[in-house]
UniProtKB/Swiss-Prot annotation:
Record function comment: Forms part of the ribosomal stalk which helps the ribosome interact with GTP-bound translation factors. Is thus essential for accurate translation.
Subunit structure: Homodimer. Part of the ribosomal stalk of the 50S ribosomal subunit. Forms a multimeric L10(L12)X complex, where L10 forms an elongated spine to which 2 to 4 L12 dimers bind in a sequential fashion. Binds GTP-bound translation factors.
Family membership noted in the UniProt record: Belongs to the bacterial ribosomal protein bL12 family.
CDD domains: Ribosomal_L7_L12
Record's protein name: Large ribosomal subunit protein bL12
Lineage: Bacteria, Pseudomonadati, Pseudomonadota, Gammaproteobacteria, Aeromonadales
Record-linked InterPro entries: Ribosomal_bL12, Ribosomal_bL12_C, Ribosomal_bL12_C/ClpS-like, Ribosomal_bL12_oligo, Ribosomal_bL12_oligo_N_sf
Keyword list, A-Z: Ribonucleoprotein, Ribosomal protein
Molecular function via GO: mRNA binding; structural constituent of ribosome
């Protein structure tokens, strides 16, 4: 006499939660498997977004202390006084393009300390 799938489903449906947990544990031991969900490694994992390696530092506003910002821009870019002043007054403007994340963060920190508003894109 064999048991049908429907009979097994009915038997499990009538069990308490603790009984179902015990049944699952017994089945894991008997068949050497785990009831944990299998992780599918497929094309979705291969299409993961690549981490950006080059960043642009954009001066969005000079802030109240424009002189300090101009000095910081001169030091960071190597521009002359007039060019740095024109760049600061033309905000929003790209200060540096295609720089590393560390360099972009350092430049942002330096300019914000001088009173500027800076974005990294």
């Amino acid at each position: 006499m064999s048991i049908t799938k429907d009979q097994i489903i009915e038997a499990v449906a009538s069990m308490s939660v603790m009984e179902v947990v015990e049944l699952i544990e017994a089945m894991e031991e008997k068949f050497g498997v785990s009831a944990a969900a299998a992780v599918m490694a497929g094309p979705a994992a291969a299409e993961a977004v690549e981490e950006k390696t080059e960043f642009d530092v954009v001066l969005t506003a000079a802030g109240a202390n424009k002189v300090a910002v101009i000095k910081a821009v001169r030091g960071a870019t190597g521009l002359g006084l007039k060019e740095a002043k024109d760049l600061v007054e033309a905000a929003p403007a790209n200060l540096k393009e295609a720089v590393s994340k560390d360099e972009a963060e350092a430049l942002k920190k330096e300019l914000e300390a001088a009173g500027a508003s800076v974005e990294i894109k």
